[in-house]
């Protein structure tokens, strides 16, 4: 396919036009008085959102250069969302301000590479200042505040704070759609995985259709169990102990399954068979997690253990296991705390080294099952459009709260960025590097300016007023008053603010150092075909 090429100022201005169109659509959502944006969907109802990354993803421009510019800024929003779960609009506003100021200097003859170095040094200094300012999250109320700001709803913030309080910072908090109005929080103690009993005959409570085993032995096998002869020696030993048995295996079928069911119905022996969770290598890993949690071993021929030779000391145990048709919950496994902690550290290391978002998510789930617990927030709404929007807001707020726990909190509302610009007095830069640093200094005003504008105030006046206030004091855009931001609960996670600035600077540096843009040549639309039918249809003969 033919390409078109633009150079120098033409190339950079084309990219800037695309960036401005995207940023202008996104920045109207910033702050407590930010507006919503309606996104048309080809199928179904339109989506209404104030989430920066969702809006950015929808924007596709026609002009090839503008399209590339918009795609670069999308990357800022997406990267910030991936790392911190929030701050996408702030990142977009910062990128727009940095690029605008940087391109003005490039057009005036500044060296783009020196500007880039100046921007990088300035951002490094501001990031360090933000982390220095950050206060550790010590109370449930602080978590509720940061989540409430992200979700623009105090009820959601309080529910997330309660969920984090129960499952810990390593715990998993998932959001599900509910058939009822309002919000519900469902907590799971212990480890839960999404496989239930193989046969309904295993249920001990027929009304609730669930099986409950108290102080059971737990057999964990990485293979199918079909031959009852393999299982009999172990069954006899377990029966002599008088305890129930939970079997977790790839599958239990044939004679082995029917023997277990018959003994359960007759009341001779209480047991439940459950399929192992996951597939392939993930299944092996999850069985290993269950073994460590319950103090057992995975019986697998890979490690030289055969089912027919298994002894009671290879079995795990727990205080209680509850099994429904869809899921199994192991409460209070008998594994050693040191071994569980070792496994947790191993999974953490795997998360850090993983390149795949999907793998990271699955590892995070495994970590939560071992280290914390699982909390499910069920969200309901009057319409499907509102439900989708609400669910998305809650998911963002959960990640925001976790980011706050990780690196602490700073004053929100664009105040931390503006007041961090004091570090520029200590930066000893000269020439175009100093010009690059100055571009960052000006860009740090942009989020606060935009929040003020969205609140119907004069941006420049607000910036000057906040610049002269005590550190940590700023504008509460919801009321128009100047307050102590942290005391009022107007806070942002330091990780969100830092990531937004670093990602914006990274893309801005690419814009400034671009000297040529190569894009696909737009194809001309084919001429419309002639209408069908015989010629001369209107003529009289």
Swiss-Prot record:
* Catalysed reaction equations from the record: ATP + H2O + a folded polypeptide = ADP + phosphate + an unfolded polypeptide
- Tell me which Gene Ontology terms the entry assigns under biological process: chaperone cofactor-dependent protein refolding; protein refolding; response to heat
Q: What are this entry's molecular-function GO terms?
A: ATP binding; ATP-dependent protein folding chaperone; isomerase activity; unfolded protein binding
Keyword Isomerase: yes or no? yes
| E.C. no | 5.6.1.7
Enzyme class (EC, first level): isomerase
Subcellular location as annotated: Cytoplasm
Cellular component GO terms, alphabetically? Answer: GroEL-GroES complex
In which residues is ATP bound? Answer: 29-32, 86-90, 413, 476-478, 492
InterPro entries, per the entry? Chaperonin_Cpn60_CS (IPR018370), Cpn60/GroEL (IPR001844), Cpn60/GroEL/TCP-1 (IPR002423), GroEL-like_apical_dom_sf (IPR027409), GROEL-like_equatorial_sf (IPR027413), TCP-1-like_intermed_sf (IPR027410)
Q: Which UniProt keywords apply?
A: ATP-binding, Chaperone, Cytoplasm, Isomerase, Nucleotide-binding
Q: Provide the function of this protein.
A: Together with its co-chaperonin GroES, plays an essential role in assisting protein folding. The GroEL-GroES system forms a nano-cage that allows encapsulation of the non-native substrate proteins and provides a physical environment optimized to promote and accelerate protein folding.
Q: How does it assemble?
A: Forms a cylinder of 14 subunits composed of two heptameric rings stacked back-to-back. Interacts with the co-chaperonin GroES.
Task: Please report which protein family the annotation says this sequence is part of.
Answer: Belongs to the chaperonin (HSP60) family.
PANTHER family listed in its UniProt record: 60 KDA HEAT SHOCK PROTEIN, MITOCHONDRIAL
Name recorded for this polypeptide: Chaperonin GroEL 2
Q: Which organism is it from?
A: Streptomyces coelicolor (strain ATCC BAA-471 / A3(2) / M145)
């Amino acid at each position: 396919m033919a390409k078109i090429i633009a150079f120098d100022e033409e190339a950079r201005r084309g990219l800037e036009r695309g960036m401005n169109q995207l940023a202008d659509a996104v920045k109207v959502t910033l702050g407590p008085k930010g507006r919503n944006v309606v996104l048309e969907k080809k199928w179904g109802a339109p989506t209404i959102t104030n989430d920066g990354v969702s809006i950015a993803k929808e924007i596709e421009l026609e002009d090839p250069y503008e399209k590339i510019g918009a795609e670069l800024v999308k990357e800022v929003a997406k990267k910030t969302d991936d790392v911190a779960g929030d701050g996408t609009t702030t990142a977009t506003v910062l990128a727009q301000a940095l690029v605008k100021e940087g391109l003005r200097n490039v057009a005036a003859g500044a060296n783009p590479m020196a500007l880039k170095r100046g921007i990088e040094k300035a951002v490094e200094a501001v990031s360090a200042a933000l982390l220095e300012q950050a206060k550790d999250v010590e109370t449930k109320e602080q978590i509720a505040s940061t989540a409430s700001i992200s979700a623009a709803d105090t009820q959601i913030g309080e529910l997330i704070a309660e969920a984090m309080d129960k499952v810990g910072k390593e715990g998993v908090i998932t959001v599900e759609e509910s058939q009822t109005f309002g919000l519900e929080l469902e907590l799971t103690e212990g480890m839960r995985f999404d496989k239930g009993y193989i046969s309904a005959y295993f249920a001990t409570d027929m009304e609730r259709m669930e099986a409950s085993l108290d102080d059971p032995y737990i057999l964990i096998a990485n293979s199918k169990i079909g031959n009852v002869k393999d299982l009999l020696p172990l069954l006899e030993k377990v029966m002599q102990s008088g305890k129930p048995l939970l079997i977790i295996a790839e599958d239990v079928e044939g004679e082995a399954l029917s023997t277990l069911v018959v003994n359960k119905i007759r009341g001779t022996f209480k047991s439940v068979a459950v399929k192992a969770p996951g597939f392939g290598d993930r299944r092996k890993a999850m069985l290993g997690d269950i073994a460590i949690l319950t103090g057992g071993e995975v019986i697998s021929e890979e490690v030289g253990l055969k089912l027919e030779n298994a002894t009671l000391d290879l079995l795990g145990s727990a205080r209680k296991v509850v099994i429904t048709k869809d899921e199994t919950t192991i409460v209070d496994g008998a594994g050693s705390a040191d071994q569980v902690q070792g496994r947790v550290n191993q999974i953490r290391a795997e998360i850090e080294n993983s390149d795949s978002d999907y793998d990271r998510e699955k590892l995070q789930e495994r970590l939560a099952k071992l280290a914390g617990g699982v909390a499910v927030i069920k969200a309901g709404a009057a319409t499907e459009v509102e439900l989708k929007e609400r669910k998305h807001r809650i998911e963002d707020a959960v990640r925001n709260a976790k980011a706050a726990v990780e690196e602490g909190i700073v004053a929100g509302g664009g105040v931390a960025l503006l007041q961090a610009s004091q570090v520029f007095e200590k930066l000893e830069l000269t020439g175009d590097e100093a010009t690059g640093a100055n571009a960052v200094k000006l860009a740090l005003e942009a989020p606060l300016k935009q929040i003020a504008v969205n609140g119907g105030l004069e941006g420049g006046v607000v910036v000057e007023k906040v610049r002269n206030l005590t550190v940590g004091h700023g504008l509460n855009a919801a009321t128009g008053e100047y307050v102590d931001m942290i005391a009022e609960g107007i806070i942002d996670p330091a990780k969100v603010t830092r990531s937004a600035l670093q990602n914006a600077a990274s893309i801005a540096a690419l814009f400034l150092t671009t000297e040529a843009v190569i894009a696909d040549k737009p194809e001309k639309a084919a001429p419309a075909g002639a209408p069908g039918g015989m010629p001369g249809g209107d003529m009289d003969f």
